[in-house]
């Protein structure tokens, strides 16, 4: 290796160490022991609750959920906290085009403050999905609230009231939160909500959502949370995605607050594998320690002044939270653009570049951005071909994603290095460096306009990298220090973002992580340029100050005289990519501990007597254990099932893989008239109906076809909206329905043929069903492993 390369090794070593240290700071803390101080949070103590709460499936309305509710009340009572149960019907429209309702039972407890100006509301949901025990989701949040409440009672009450809300029915429809918010909407002004969630088995706890005008909230979070991991970019993205938690309903009702969750190891999410044993107790420690500290922080301030006039930009750096006002987003983005422009002008004045070459490099910089993204997606497609079961993973992540994520990072770095090596002779290294920084500056401006909380991802790396280049151009002797320092902010900002983005979006969207790696790489290209630069008579730093002999020369020294094997860099990265990828694939297989998901549902059309097995999972019959098991029930072709069984997921067009199933002899749901009013002048009349499942299924559905003249609807006394999605004028799902059914009040004109259905959990008692093998498990879907019975009934306002 040339002496020139050796001179820059300390800078590269510092960058690599900084990268490793930045990512390592995201590691979860060690769980505090059971004998930790009584006023502190202990994951070991909290985990005892997790083992009880997550020992069985406990969906809304189940006997197991009632058992867990009594346990929560008993634990609160043992700590001297009185709890009440809020029972009622919650209604939500957040999870789809229709309306979802449920009979819910929230546990609500209050710790009175000494001098309250408002209340801190701690929220976690107590129910699980219908196929998994919810060890993390949301056993972690529930246990953290119980341990936080215990610590608060031992450490002195805060000034403000603390309200503990253990919601019911979150997984089904957010209906517990809906019921609580509906009853306490008037408390939004002087409250701060802290919602605790989990979407996986571990990883750092990320504060991923806030209410608007979050500056005061973020200030408290950064100052008091012992493990403050959160980014304003995540908040901006989450606001634009159709994802919802209980916090959604609080935020929409005007409550201020923060939403936190751990999201890694997401292959267990909403599956039978979400057990207490699968939980990272360090994640539980971080969840609870943050919740306790923030409760005390918000409990000691005047909650009448916890909203500001804008949002902060913030991101984690080495265990701290860096933040600045949103008002600085545009000035910093503009300053970054000016710094890059100044670097281009100074480099041109030094005759190191020409504008055409910088422009050419700017255009060609699209290549590493696009190619790395495409290759990352092709890599996921290849993994899906090798391991077909990953097509059925809800979050798009395998069980052991670490090596595969590393492969994506190395692949993006390889593409960027190859781009540089191939073009530096034609374009020039300095021109390519400036082109990359120009892309960062441009993206900083674009994000400032479209996603203000994410502008820092590009603007700050561009600003500091351009600053380092300007210093080196002006004072060449400072280059060995200026370039690494200029590149360091890109590492500090983008390395943790990449590490957090992979579990957030999954390898199925690996292109996003690859893109951020390339952006970080653009900030490192100036350092790479000096590293691979040719020898000169003087020190290496002098080369950036040496004018070219002609005005159109892009490099003062020919590359041929530099490091003779620059192609080794992309070659090493390519080999590393392949090694990480092969090892990642080898360790990402399925077994009894890490089973392959398989989606299956039974559906009976009571009108025709025809029953089917249905699966939303694509695939071929001989590709993997899940597909071999599914082949006993469904074929590879698809059938339109959405019109007959609208509750089934399937594809957007309502098609699913199907197979003939034995028809079970069970009674179909009924819709009976209780009363009918007289039609008004426009022909509308109000009908009172009862929808019931004679077989005792806990979920009921009512659907009216598009074109039905429906003026208003109330279900169990709650108004619900009508939809206009092209298929159904009304779509209602009711969870945890009473055994005597639910009351529906329709104001309708004319006649309509309603589609009604009921849903029950489990397939094991059905004729023709074969149990899954040990290495296959139910899929993470709300309609997995359920039996649906549907029929069509006439509804009319006309007298018979």
What are these model-predicted stretches?
Residues 317-335, 397-405:
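Juxtamembrane/start-of-transmembrane alpha-helix segments at the extracytoplasmic/lumenal side
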Residues 30-323, 703-706, 722-749, 798-800:
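Soluble extramembrane regions of membrane proteins in the secretory/endomembrane system
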Residues 338-653, 661:
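Alpha-helical transmembrane segments of integral membrane proteins
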């Amino acid at each position: 290796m040339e002496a020139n390369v050796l001179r820059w090794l300390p800078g590269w070593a510092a960058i690599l160490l900084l990268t490793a240290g930045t990512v390592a700071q995201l590691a979860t803390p060690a769980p505090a022991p059971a004998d930790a101080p009584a006023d502190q949070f202990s994951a070991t103590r909290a985990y005892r609750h997790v083992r009880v709460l997550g020992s069985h499936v406990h969906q809304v309305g189940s006997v197991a959920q009632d058992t867990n509710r009594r346990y929560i009340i008993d634990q609160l009572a043992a700590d001297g906290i009185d709890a009440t149960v809020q029972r009622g019907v919650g209604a939500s429209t957040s999870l789809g085009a229709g309306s979802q309702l449920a009979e819910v039972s929230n546990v609500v407890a209050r710790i009175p403050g000494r001098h309250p100006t408002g209340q801190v509301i701690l929220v976690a949901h107590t129910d699980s999905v219908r196929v998994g025990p919810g060890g993390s989701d949301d056993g972690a949040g529930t246990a953290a609230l119980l341990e936080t409440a215990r610590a608060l009672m031992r450490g002195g009450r805060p000034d403000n009231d603390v309200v503990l809300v253990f919601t019911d029915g979150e997984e089904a429809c957010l209906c517990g939160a809906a019921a609580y918010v509906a009853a306490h909407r008037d408390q939004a002004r002087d409250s701060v909500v802290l919602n605790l969630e989990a979407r996986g088995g571990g990883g750092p706890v990320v504060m991923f959502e806030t209410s608007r005008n979050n500056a005061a909230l973020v200030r408290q979070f950064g100052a008091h949370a012992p493990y403050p991991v959160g980014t304003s970019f995540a908040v901006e993205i989450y606001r634009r995605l159709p994802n919802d938690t209980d916090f959604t309903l609080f935020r929409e009702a005007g409550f201020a607050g923060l939403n936190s969750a751990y999201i890694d190891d997401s292959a267990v999410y909403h599956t039978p594998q979400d057990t207490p044993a699968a939980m990272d107790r360090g994640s539980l420690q971080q969840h609870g320690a943050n919740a306790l500290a923030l409760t005390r922080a918000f409990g000691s301030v005047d909650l009448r002044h916890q909203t500001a006039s804008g949002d902060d930009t913030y991101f984690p750096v080495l265990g701290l939270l860096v933040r600045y006002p949103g008002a600085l987003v545009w000035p910093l983005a503009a300053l970054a653009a000016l710094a890059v422009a100044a670097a281009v002008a100074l480099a041109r004045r030094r005759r190191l570049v020409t504008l055409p070459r910088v422009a050419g490099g700017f255009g060609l910089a699209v290549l590493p951005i696009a190619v790395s993204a495409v290759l990352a997606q092709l890599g996921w497609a290849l993994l899906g071909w090798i391991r077909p079961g990953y097509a059925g993973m809800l979050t798009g992540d395998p069980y052991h994603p670490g090596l595969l994520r590393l492969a994506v990072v190395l692949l993006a770095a390889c593409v960027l290095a190859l781009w540089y090596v191939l073009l530096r002779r034609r374009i020039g290294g300095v021109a390519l460096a400036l082109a990359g920084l120009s892309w960062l500056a441009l993206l900083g401006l674009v994000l400032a306009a479209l996603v203000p909380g994410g502008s820092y991802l590009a603007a700050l790396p561009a600003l500091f990298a351009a600053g380092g280049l300007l210093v080196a151009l002006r004072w060449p002797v400072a280059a060995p220090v200026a370039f690494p320092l200029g590149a360091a902010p890109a590492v500090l900002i983008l390395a943790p973002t990449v590490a957090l983005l992979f579990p957030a979006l999954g390898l199925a969207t690996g292109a996003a992580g690859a893109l951020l790696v390339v952006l970080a790489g653009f900030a490192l290209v100036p350092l790479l340029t000096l590293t691979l630069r040719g020898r000169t008579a003087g020190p290496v730093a002098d080369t950036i100050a040496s004018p070219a002999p002609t005005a159109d020369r892009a490099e003062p020294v020919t590359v041929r005289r530099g490091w003779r094997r620059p192609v080794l860099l992309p070659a090493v990265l390519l080999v590393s990519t392949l090694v990480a990828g092969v090892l990642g694939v080898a360790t990402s297989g399925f077994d009894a501990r890490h089973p392959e998901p398989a989606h299956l549902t039974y559906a009976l059309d009571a009108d025709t007597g025809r029953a089917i097995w249905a699966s939303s999972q694509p695939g071929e019959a001989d590709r993997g254990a899940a597909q071999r098991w599914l082949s006993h029930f469904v074929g590879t072709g698809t059938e339109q099932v959405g019109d007959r069984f609208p509750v089934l997921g399937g594809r957007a067009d309502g098609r699913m893989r199907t197979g003939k199933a034995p028809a079970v002899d069970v009674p179909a749901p009924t819709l009976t008239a209780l009363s009918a009013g007289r039609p008004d002048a426009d022909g509308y009349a109000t009908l009172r109906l009862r929808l019931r499942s004679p077989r005792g299924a806990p979920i009921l559905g009512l659907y009216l076809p598009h074109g039905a003249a429906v003026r208003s609807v109330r279900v169990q006394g709650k108004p619900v909206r009508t939809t206009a999605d092209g298929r159904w004028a009304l779509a209602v799902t009711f969870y945890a329905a009473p055994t005597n059914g639910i009351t529906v009040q329709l104001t309708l004109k004319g006649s309509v043929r309603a589609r009604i259905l009921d849903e029950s959990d489990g397939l094991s008692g059905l004729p023709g069903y074969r149990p899954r093998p040990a290495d296959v498990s139910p899929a993470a879907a709300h309609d997995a492993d359920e039996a649906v019975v549907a029929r069509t009934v006439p509804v009319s306002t006309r007298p018979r």
